[in-house]
C-alpha cells in the first residue's frame, strides 16, 4: 500500500453545544488533516431506509448547509386583561413565523435547489394571564445553493425587524453557521464509484438526490477533496418508505449492513493508494 491511512474518530458528530467549539471544525483547527497531510477523505453514514448491501451517493452537493438562528422579539408587558396597553411579542412572533415562510414559497427559486426554514423552539411567558415582554424563536436554515443561502439570510434580517416594528415592537436576528454544504469532489466521486461497484457489485451502488440534512464532515471537505455516502441498514421486511427515521425513538438498523460498510471503506482505501 503506497501511502498512509488516517482514521478519524470524531467527537460531537452532531455538533458541539451552543456557544462551544467542537466536532469536525475543531479537529481541523487542531491539525487532524496534517502530519501526515491528508490528500483525500472518505465518510460513510448508515441509513435506515436503504437496503442492506447497498450504498447511495451523489456527486457534488449531497447534504445541505445548515445555520442556526435565534430571533429575539421585544414587546411591552401587560396584564392579559388589558392587551391594548401591551405590545404582544407572542402575536409578533406568530406574524414573523408566517412571514419568514414566504421566503421559501415566494423568494426562493425552488426549481434550482430545495431550501428549508424550520422553527423548532419558541419561548415566551411564564403565566397564563400575563402578556410577556419578550419572546424567542430558535430554528434552522437548510440550503443546497450558496446564493439561496445568502438570499434567505438577507430576507430574514429584513423581515423579522420590520414585522416587529409594524406591531410596535422590535426584533433582532442572529444567524450562525453550523455546517457547510457537504460537497463530494466530482473527480474523487468518479473514482470512488468505480471502486464501490467493484467491491459491492454494480447494482448495489445507487445514485441519490441531495438531502436537506446536514453533516459537519463538510468541514473536512472544505480543506481536502472528500467523498461522503450512505450505507444500507434497512431492517428486513420493512418498507423503505415506512422505515423509522433517524433521531427518533423508533430508529433501528440492521447490523448486517455494517460488514458491507467495512468492505466499501477498505476497497476505497486500497484502490486510492494503488
Label for each model-derived stretch:
Residues 94-274:
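Metal-dependent amide/peptide-bond hydrolase catalytic core
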Residues 1-121, 126-130, 240:
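Histidine/acidic-residue-rich, glycine-tolerant segments that coordinate divalent metal ions
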